[in-house]
Each structure stands twice: as structure tokens, then as C-alpha cells.
Amino acid sequence: IQAKVKAEGKHKKQSGGHGQYGHVWIEFEPGSNEKMTFEEKVFGGSVPKNYFPAVEKGLREACEHGVLAGYPVVNLKATLLDGSYHPVDSSEMAFKMAAAIAYKEGLKQAKPVLLEPIGYLKVYVPESIMGDIIGDINKRRGQIMGMGESEKEGLNLVEAEVPMSETFKYATDLRSMSQGRGIFTFDFA
């Protein structure tokens, strides 16, 4: 996600006898960790401590299915700020559901982005076509990381980070540009 947002999640169900009630306010912001980071900053007992693990579990389960194309969410920090409970109707399940509702509402507003895999491309080509190769890498949304002479005789090296989706058919394209003299390797970054 790219923005910091606060979201409310309220799970309330009454069906004769005991109902279900869980209510949370959670702040979502970009995190620095690959996994979701969970904190609680609840004051005054508005959400009892024994429900904190249920809120965290609800968020962790929800993170497995992102709001964009259903992919898992990474680099997320979630902070439980506030909420409310009912002495009879509140349960761990109700707070787990409330957290999942807050997650769905909050992430929609938090400017989510879909990440794509990036790879490390090394291209060995004759010096005479270095400009063409660099132009082609730029056209493929690549970031040139370095260039210069290589250990392979008569060939220069261009190193770049390139989105994986842009490297399909690269072998054919490189062969055409270099008249069969270019070599490349592609590894995940």
C-alpha cells in the first residue's frame, strides 16, 4: 500500500440467545517488513487484551488474499487503535471477523499496488551494438545497473534490472539485434 489510513470493522450478529459483537479501529500503513507487522495501541480497555490475538489472527488470514487480484499483501503495518466490546456477545471469532472487515475497507482506501517480479539481466554483446541494447532495455522498463568490458573476449557487458514480464522472447530479440552474437543470463533479483 502507498497511503496511511484508519478503518473501522464492526461485526454484529444477533440470532436469539448470545449474539456476536466485535468492533475495531485499525490503522494501516506501509511497513518495512515482508510480512505484516501488528501493534496495539489501545487505551482504557475499549478492546480487552484477550481479544488482541484474535484481531491479529484475523488480519494475518486476511493478508493471504489481497484486494488486488487476490495476491498476498506484503509490507503492511497494522495498528489496533480502538474499538468496543459487549460483555456477553463479544468473542474471539467476532473480533477476528471485525479485523477482517476493517482490513477490506482500509486496504481499498490505502492505494494498493500490484508488485511484479524483477530480475537481474546480464547481456554480453559486441561494442558496436551497445547503444541498441541499452535502448532496448530502457524500452523494456529496465534500469541499467552497469556496463563495461567483460571477461568474454570481444564482448562488452550490460547489467540491468528488468521486470520479468518484459523478458519473454528476449532470446529471439537479442539474437536479431546482435545477429546471433549476443549472450544473456537472467536471474531473479
Give the location of each predicted region.
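Accessory interaction regions appended to the cores of large information-processing enzymes
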Residues: 1-189
